């Protein structure tokens, strides 16, 4: 293989390896009422030397359990006290880019889902043909995109089970969130 420097301007075939990392932007807990949407606002100013990081995306992971309660004599019937799942929806927003994902909780271990927004050219990773080194770099170097304000919107739509003589109550859910910037930390280019 040729050295990268000797072929930086020529088009050709490349093996491109990229190592991704993450940088925590925010985390916390919020109680979200049924039908409510809360917005969590964040900014990369909270990260030291953020301008030196190649930010290529953002990921939010939400974790939640079921807290539906039931009461009444009818709850002794088989299945009457089983909760109905709630739908937890998250929208990750950066500039004009956004993505929405939903998940449902269950009566058991905590459930979770993630939502990601990315702005790098994933076709420039792996075996890449007929491009120059500078085209690869342009596709994978964010050039400062990723700095600034972010928002995570979380909403809950509860489902309540129940049966005759068994009343269910579910006003919302406790939602834990973790927001991470996706970083491209290292790039290896081999001209083939």
Model-based region annotation:
Residues 62-68, 94-96, 156-162, 181-185:
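Beta-strand elements of well-folded, non-transmembrane domains
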Residues 22-29, 98-147:
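Extended, solvent-exposed segments with strong compositional bias
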Residues 34-119:
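Acidic, Ser/Thr/Pro-rich low-complexity intrinsically disordered segments
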Residues 1-28:
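N-terminal leader/pro-regions and domain N-caps
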Residues 190-192:
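Conserved small/polar residues in nucleotide/adenosyl-binding loops
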Residues 55-57, 130-165:
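Noncatalytic modules at the cell exterior or secretory-pathway interfaces
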Residues 33, 51-53, 143-147, 172:
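Surface-exposed coil/turn segments at beta-strand junctions on protein surfaces, enriched
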Residues 150, 158-186:
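Edge beta-strands of jelly-roll/beta-sandwich modules across compartments, strongly enriched
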């Amino acid at each position: 293989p040729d050295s990268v420097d000797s072929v930086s301007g020529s088009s050709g075939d490349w093996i491109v390896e990229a190592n991704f990392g993450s940088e925590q932007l925010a985390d916390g807990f919020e109680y979200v009422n049924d039908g409510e949407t809360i917005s969590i606002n964040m900014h990369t100013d909270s990260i030291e030397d953020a301008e030196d990081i190649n930010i290529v995306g953002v990921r939010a992971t939400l974790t939640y359990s079921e807290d539906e309660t039931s009461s009444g004599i009818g709850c002794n019937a088989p299945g009457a006290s089983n909760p109905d799942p709630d739908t937890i929806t998250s929208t990750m927003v950066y500039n004009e880019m956004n993505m929405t994902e939903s998940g449902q909780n269950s009566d058991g271990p905590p459930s979770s889902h993630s939502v990601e927004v990315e702005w790098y050219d994933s076709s420039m990773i792996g075996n890449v043909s007929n491009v120059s080194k500078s085209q690869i770099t342009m596709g994978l170097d964010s050039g400062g995109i990723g700095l600034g304000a972010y928002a995570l919107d979380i909403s809950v739509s509860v489902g309540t089970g129940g049966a005759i003589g068994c009343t269910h109550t579910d006003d919302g859910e406790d939602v834990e969130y973790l927001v991470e910037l996706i970083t491209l930390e290292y790039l290896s280019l081999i001209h083939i």
